[in-house]
Amino acid sequence: MANQVQRQEQQRSITVNTLIKQDSYKKRFNELLGKKAPGFISSMLNVANLPTLKDAEPNSIISSAVVAATLDLPIDQNLGFAYIVPYNTKVGNEYIKKAQFQMGYKGYIQLAMRTGQYKTINAIEVYEGEIKRVNRLTGEIEFDYDNEFINREIVVGYVAYFKLLNGFEKTVYMSKEEMEIHAKKYSQSYSSSKDWVVKGSLWSTDFDGMAIKTVLKRLLSKYGILSIEMQSAITNDQAVINDGTPEYVDNQVREELLQNANKKTIGIPVDAVETEFKEVKDVENNNIQETIDQPMFEGPGF
């Protein structure tokens, strides 16, 4: 018991601020970011000091930030590209707060457009009366644009679509009922027996945003062009990076924190895509997992 208390006290004394003062961390940040390293470090410190993240395990904050940096995506929740989100994850018999990297749906669109192969890409809500029919075999949707009785107060489904420059196009549609089943199946918080946990889930507070990301991720992971950046995003989305291995914390029995996204931005150059931080996964040396069946985005949907 005494050893456990001592270990907890030692962990509290280690912060992001103390870690980045070490020469090894400074050197790696400088190698990764060059002249932008000081700005990145300053932004990361601001993120680490947010009320929702200040008690999170510091290495998990750093590794999550580096994932966002390698993808050249800002982590301001108001922009909707990527997020650093705190979670209570069970380690042994204890719950420890760690930071988790999460993609936003705009981040997926951004990575897709960077390939230069997409002519059009979008994901939207579908309102009552908008659709005539859905072809289950091809995925094609026929919209009824002339229907004067379209009810834009009622969302009945979600659709994601892209068309490549070579002419290939694909559509994926999920009804609201299908999305509800999906959310309850893969989100521990949304399916929790505790009412306050359910209400705190973004599936409750921003169902449409969460659903848009889900259908877009399903489209891109199954039919899109999987660039190295896209593979990394899909693999690391909703994961805590432990020694280079993504750990999907929503697969554990845990209750997510109510307030779970920061509002700070980190801007990183697109060419800064390689790092030797042990917490970051090298996607070229690992098999890319099909993560669309992992629990969906528990940070803000936008």
Protein language model features and the residues they cover:
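Binding-interface segments
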Residues: 16-226
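Glycine- and charge-rich intrinsically disordered segments
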Residues: 1-27, 230-302
